[in-house]
Structure formats: C-alpha cells, structure tokens
Regions:
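Domain-level signal for soluble alpha/beta catalytic cores
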Residues: 1-397
Length: 397
C-alpha cells in the first residue's frame, strides 16, 4: 500500500498574509476584506500541499495570526484572542511564571528559567550563536482575571470554512483535512489571578476548548491537539523533578484533555507531542519512553511526535516493545524543523520503514517533526515537504 503523508500544521506565511495580519491589528483592514484575502491564501497553501503530493492537509494554520515571518509561538498565542476572562499587559513573555501548583506540587518555571536555557545561557544570549532568543520585544500577554469562556466561535468557524473550501477546490474529501487546536495544558501556561491553582486553570481551559474541538470535528475535519506541554514541559521545571512526579503532573493534563474530548470520535483526533520548536541543544529533554504511555491514553487515534531531529531520532526503537492499541496509528516526524538541511528522500524512506516494519504500513502516516511555519525559511520548508512526499513514495515500493 502507499504510505500516506501529512505535516504537523504550521506552514510558512506569505508576505501578503503577514502584512494583512498587521493591518488588521492596526485597524486599517476590515473583517470582510481580511476574510476574503485569508481565503485566497488558504486556497493557495492547500493547493500547494496537494501539488507536492501530501495526502492529509490543512490551512497552514493561517488563521493563527503571525505578524512576523519568524514566530515560534503562533500555535499558542492564537488562543489568547479566543478566551474570555483575560486581561492583557505588555510584558516580556519569557519572564512570566505560569500558575502555581496545588498544595506545593510541581509547577512550571518561567520560560527564561528553562534548564536548557540556563545550561547554555551564553549561547542563548549571543546574537551570533544561531539560537539567540533574548531581548524579544514585549507582547500583550494575558493574565486570567475572570472566569474563562470561549469567544472564538467566529474565528474557528472561519478556519473550518476556509479549510473545507480549499479542500473542495483541489478535489479532496473533508476527511483529508485537519485543523490544529491547542491543548488545555498548553493553554494554561499564562499568568493567573483568578483560579485557585494550576489544576483549576487546566480544567477550566478544558471546558473552554471543548467547544473548539467539537466545532472542528462536527464539521467532519480532524482536530490536531497541539500538546508540547506533555514533553517540552519537563525542561520548564527547574530544578529537575523526578520522572514519577512529572508523570503525575502530566496525567492531570491528559485527564483534562480527555474530558474536553468526551463524545468526540477518536478517529477525528490526533495528538501532537513535541519537545519545543526552538533551535537549541535540548540536552535536558525528557525521554519519550518515560511519557509515551501517557500519550497513548489520549482519546485520539493518531499520535504525532518528533522522530527526525538529532535528539530524538534514536527513539523509534521503543515501538518494538510497545503494543499499539487497537485503532491507533503513528504519525512520526521524518523530516525536521530543527535543521535547514533538507533530508534526502532515501533517508526519509528509511525512517518511514523503521516504523512501518514494526507496526505495519497501514498504521503509519509520515509527517514532519513539528510545524515549519515561522521556524524554517519558506523555500526550505517547502523543499522539506517535497522530500517527505518523495520519501513516502520510495518507502511504499
């Protein structure tokens, strides 16, 4: 059989879309004109995915606004405009500390206190290092000051309608489309001045996000739950916790997500695990084997995860010892967002076969490690997707 292909969601924004996002934020572009331009852009990005040969496609997350070509956080910050109960202040987001843990339990440190960033502080502070992220401009960052509510219906319906319109234009069924949405655990990593503790925030986020997930799946599209907090969150705890305590912390987030997904067909859900999108050493990442069973507890039949970058490419072997639950399938990353080197199609094919030879061709969908938009130069990102499609064809022979 032919092994199917997809990607994790975020694709490079065009200069026209970035400028339109800026104009809309400044109030010089009205909603009707913006929606028309956005639809044209979504039609174009879906068409390009189809022309490359990708099977399961999306809107490039074009509805998750970016006003700069380089943006590692649009997958998260898009949610700020879809939650009621937030107040905003211009701050350096890396210094914000998420909600405190319940009864002295684990909680996240600030982004700036990440163990990876602390260990390699000289590199992160050096503009010539290639991983410099310091001195970013302040952004309007949210604090929870009231009961969280969902105010994103119009925005998510635009995402849904745009994706379905573009799928129809290229002759693809709705079942070949997906829309990305944030997990409760990731959405909860904002400042809190209302709820009792971090767990209360996570459960409140789950109640809010249920509406977004349900609208996407009710439309026949697959929802991809972006949950880097499950893996990447380990590094944001300083000092390093025990694996046992971290698993208990993460289990709360899994349970809250399953609450949000209650009643939704798992066939229409895929769960994305990653160790963060920043281009750094990642020596403090948690091993996939320590959390993979938690990821498999999610009521999602698809599991997407990093498997191509240099820190995690070796972990494909864990699947030799895991019995994949009935109905579930793997969506491994076989090209990476962490390097500008475009993977050779034969290497891509080898990586695909590593998984397919263990679980079967029909239970593998080849993908990217993470989103490419805002992280990889556009022409390189598209070349990586071409290599992905070519590699899948080779692996299917």
């Amino acid at each position: 059989m032919t092994i199917r292909t997809t990607h994790v969601g975020s694709l490079p924004r065009t200069p026209e879309l970035i400028e339109a996002n800026r104009a809309r934020r400044e109030g010089s572009l009205g909603d009707a004109d913006f929606t028309s331009l956005l639809q044209d852009q979504v039609d174009g990005v879906v068409k390009r995915q189809a022309e490359i040969g990708l099977d399961i496609v999306n809107d490039g997350e074009y509805g998750h606004a970016m006003i700069d070509a380089v943006d590692y956080g649009a997958w998260w910050t898009y949610s700020f405009s879809r939650f009621g109960g937030l107040s905003f202040e211009d701050v350096q987001r890396f210094d914000v500390r998420p909600p405190a843990g319940r009864d002295g339990r684990l909680s996240f440190s600030s982004f700036a206190e990440r163990r990876d960033w602390q260990r390699f502080a000289d590199a992160y502070a050096d503009p010539d290092s290639g991983i410099h992220i310091a001195n970013r401009n302040p952004i309007a960052f949210p604090t929870i000051t009231g009961e969280l509510t969902y105010i994103g219906a119009e925005a998510v319906e635009r995402d849904i309608a745009g994706t379905k319109h573009a799928l129809e234009a290229v002759g693809k069924p709705v079942s070949d489309g997906f829309v990305a949405a944030i997990s409760p655990g990731s959405a909860a990593r904002v400042a809190n001045a209302f709820y009792e503790d971090d767990e209360a925030v996570v459960w409140a986020c789950a109640d809010v996000l249920r509406e977004e997930y349900k609208r996407i799946t009710d439309a026949g599209l697959t929802v991809q739950i972006d949950a880097p907090d499950i893996a990447e969150g380990w590094d944001q705890m300083n000092p390093e916790p025990s694996v046992e305590d971290y698993r208990a912390f993460s289990r709360v987030r899994i349970d809250a997500l399953n609450h949000a997904l209650e009643g939704i067909d798992p066939d229409l859900v895929r769960f994305h695990v990653c160790w963060g999108s920043w281009h750094g050493p990642h020596t403090t990442d948690i091993a996939f084997k320590d959390i993979v069973d938690l990821a498999l507890l999610v009521n999602a039949n698809g599991l997407t995860f990093e498997a191509a970058n240099a820190r995690h490419a070796h972990e494909w072997t864990i699947w030799r010892d895991i019995e994949l639950p009935e109905g579930k399938y793997l969506i491994p990353g076989v090209v990476s967002h962490s390097t500008n080197v475009v993977e050779h199609p034969e290497l891509v094919a080898q990586r695909i076969r590593q998984f397919a030879d263990i679980v079967g061709d029909e239970r593998v969908v080849a993908s990217t490690d993470c989103g490419l938009g805002g992280r990889i130069y556009p022409s390189i990102a598209w070349a990586k997707l071409e290599a992905l499609a070519q590699g899948a064809r080779l692996a299917s022979k």
